[in-house]
């Protein structure tokens, strides 16, 4: 409850701030209504379940999250993975996956993994986000044009099926869809209409047209899903199955990762707009609790929503009160106007999702960044992008993270320098029968081949080899085992090994692993100058004798 507590300490829950937060919460609630319904339908569930998700999740995240201006609810980022779960396991499976994802998010927050999410490479995030946008866009063609549901299990099969059926589009449905899309695009460009929540107005206009003219054959919320019940979310237990739960662990992990990424990105955007500072770990705790509790009230996966959070800030929201009011607004609309939703054309909701898909994909930004990005980043983007489209999001995220990690390890290994020092002032301070090797960078598994190859090139028989670790910031278990092996090999050849310059962390690792004992007394020396002086003294004594 960091956000709520900080807002209280800052006086933002006082009466002086009530008006701003109440107004912001009402406006965000109006904006969230069509989005929540659209995301639910795209996920393959009933529209009211999207509203339930927004109501329950937003209250929990407002109270227990780490950002005092965050607005939570269903988002477009989840559509690709959640629709697949719904198609395969049904709504009960979707609820179980949400619950599992919530538990994972909760533990991520409790074990302070919030800071680690930012280590996921940006090309991976951009790639799967753009891919999700394309999947959403194509997935709404049937509703937008009045086409039969696309056949085929995979994206390319569905795309081919939709392209073949385009000549059979339903004229009235397509006209309503195009009208809705045009209104969405034009409203922000008209000064008088710019501040109005365009998705809500599009929904109202399209619904009024359908109510007045009753276009034959136009699919509506009522014809597809029946009447939306005029009831608030109530407690109910999802149907649990042990076998199904095991199958849902991997998809749930993907949901958790997506939720963590989007909620923390939203919190960062909010900090930039509002001048606040969020707690990443507490935000994950709040998101985890929201996803654990929401399935028990008829909802599904939720996360911080960037667009709704930004709207909250622009309208003057500065405390968690706005998030609570947003939930109350949705609840009141549900109680007062649920029957009116029956005439909402699905084509209008599809138009809203077209805009969501475009905003998620950010084509202009992607092109601009990819033009300047290194080749490896471009390749990583397209790997994740095409896997998201052609395989699925689970595969895309996992392979994207693995490939980016391997690339990073390769780059780090290249950056590690292992060299024989012969012509520097420090090398000149050593006796002639002493060789010095310098390691610069993390002493980890990726650099061990370079280390062993460099030291294997010792084709003389020096009396002593000095390993200078002054610039080694970290040593892992592979580095320790390799160092142990190399030291043992040199000692078998009668070559003394001295290690110098290790920092406290590296020294502690060497001591725990027994490397310092293996070196022998007096062969681990903190300062290089002390080692050089000792070797010169020993050489002088040997020469004198």
Regions found by a protein language model. Give the residues of each.
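Transmembrane helical cores of multi-pass ion-transport proteins
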Residues: 1-419, 482
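Structured cytosolic domains appended to multi-pass membrane proteins
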Residues: 420-545
